UniProtKB/Swiss-Prot annotation:
The active site is at 209 (proton donor), 343 (proton acceptor). It comes from Histophilus somni (strain 2336). Pathway: Carbohydrate degradation; glycolysis; pyruvate from D-glyceraldehyde 3-phosphate: step 4/5. This is Enolase. Component of the RNA degradosome, a multiprotein complex involved in RNA processing and mRNA degradation. Its cofactor is Mg(2+). Mg(2+) binds at residues 246, 291, 318. One of its GO terms (cellular component) is phosphopyruvate hydratase complex. It catalyses: (2R)-2-phosphoglycerate = phosphoenolpyruvate + H2O.
Length: 433
């Protein structure tokens, strides 16, 4: 048992050049946990609040000194002397001290950084790897799996400065036998995609998550480029590699007229038409997972989409559920989607994140662990994916160290666990077992 002796917050810089909160939690015996909060670009309206200073003279208003001050003062005072291994209690103290529904007093960025740093410090004090401690906190000690990567190799929407409406076009190396082999397949497809794009005279500049961000005439053209790259790399699309998309539909949904307006290809759809547009893409390409295929508030549209596609495609709720058990519970009751994206800064603590994963799994939904578009070298989500045996992870493409840090941590974990952490491949995806 080790008590907290010191909590430190500081302002550091994320992968987009914006400030974020880093926290250190120090325990008796010299054990230290260090963690940083990520930050999203396309955010759900019901996410926990990321506290920014709003001082335009400093970091264009994006400073986080208020959140850092909360860590160094109110949070530190409340936590010193508390037992670090009581993660749920630590998180509850911060949530109650904040006292708001959406963590707007201290900021989810402050509370999450401390929550994760505390878990890391507790793991260190127990002489355990973080993934093993997370499995204990999850009530599933010793139960692990290596996640199937969903690699975002063409970026559009809010993650790129191009004319592609759909935010992420991803590959899943389902033919791999191990996580390490999956990363090799992903890297080979990524490099071949660069050749395909260059051959078409298209840009190979990368977006926030390390994927390419070319100007393409349509979403189908993005899928066609990926198909060509998969084949060029010597793999079979649909067998070795499957496809996934994050539509981030809320970003092009017009609330006034209820239409999905895809400006990049000059098309507008009603809610049901958009579902059938996606259905058409699924018939043409082996797309096994679609995230946020409707606006976060269009629950009727989601219900229809689940009815049409839910038995054959994993339908992931991101902006829809925002890692929030209250919203997820309602979605489960109404038969909305069949999977949840897990981003721990949407809810703001490790305990609440684990509760969302458990609720999803208990209801037969899958849980996909995810990064944010603004990241740091912090690789906690790799341990979270393994320690909860979630089965799937989204942490970007095969470039940018902020993305690769997570993949490299997964390589280390797979090496340490060997056969104790099976790589499930396509079986991890809802509707594909």
């Amino acid at each position: 048992m080790a008590k907290i002796v010191k909590v430190i917050g500081r302002e550091i810089i994320d992968s987009r050049g914006n400030p974020t909160v880093e926290a250190e939690v120090h325990l008796e015996g010299g054990f230290v946990g260090l963690a940083a909060a990520p930050s999203g670009a396309s955010t759900g309206s019901r996410e926990a609040l990321e506290l920014r200073d709003g001082d335009k003279a400093r970091f264009l208003g994006k400073g986080v000194l208020k959140a850092v001050s909360a860590v160094n003062n109110e949070i530190a005072t409340a936590l010193v002397g508390k037992e670090a291994s009581n993660q749920a209690e630590i998180d509850q103290i911060m949530i109650e001290l904040d006292g708001t529904e959406n963590k707007s007093k201290f900021g989810a960025n402050a509370i999450l950084a401390v929550s994760l740093a505390n878990a890391k410090a507790a793991a260190a004090s127990k002489g355990m790897p973080l993934y093993a401690w997370i499995a204990e906190l999850n009530g599933t000690p010793g139960v692990y799996s290596m996640p199937l990567p969903m690699m975002n190799i063409i970026n559009g929407g809010e993650h790129a400065d191009n004319n592609v409406d759909i935010q992420e076009f991803m590959i899943q190396p389902v033919g791999a036998k191990t996580l390490k082999e999956a990363l090799r397949i992903g890297a080979e497809v990524f490099h071949n995609l660069a050749k395909v794009l260059k051959g078409k005279g298209l840009s190979t500049a990368v977006g926030d998550e390390g994927g390419f961000a070319p100007n393409l005439e349509s979403n189908a053209a993005a899928l066609a480029c990926i198909k060509e790259a998969v084949e060029k790399a010597g793999y079979v699309l649909g067998k070795d590699v499957t496809l996934a998309m994050d539509c981030a539909s809320s970003e092009f949904y017009n609330k006034e007229n209820g239409m999905y307006e895809m400006k990049g290809e000059g098309k507008s759809f009603t809610s049901q038409e958009f579902t059938h547009y996606l259905e058409g893409l699924c018939k043409e390409y082996p797309i096994v997972s679609i995230e946020d295929g409707q606006d976060e508030s269009d629950w009727d549209g989601f219900a229809y989409q689940t009815k049409v596609l839910g038995d054959k495609v994993q339908l992931v709720g991101d902006d829809l559920f925002v890692t929030n058990t209250k919203i997820l519970k309602e979605g489960i009751e109404k038969g909305i989607a069949n999977s949840i994206l897990i981003k721990f800064n949407q809810i703001g603590s490790l305990t609440e994140t684990l509760a969302a994963i458990k609720m999803a799994k208990d209801a037969g939904y899958t849980a996909v662990i995810s990064h944010r578009s603004g990241e740091t070298e912090d690789a906690t989500i790799a341990d979270l994916a393994v320690g909860t045996a979630a089965g799937q992870i989204k942490t970007g493409s095969m470039s940018r160290s902020d993305r690769i840090a997570k993949y490299n941590q997964l390589i280390r974990i797979e090496e340490a666990l060997g056969e104790k952490a099976p790589f499930l491949g396509l079986k991890a995806v809802k509707g594909q077992a």
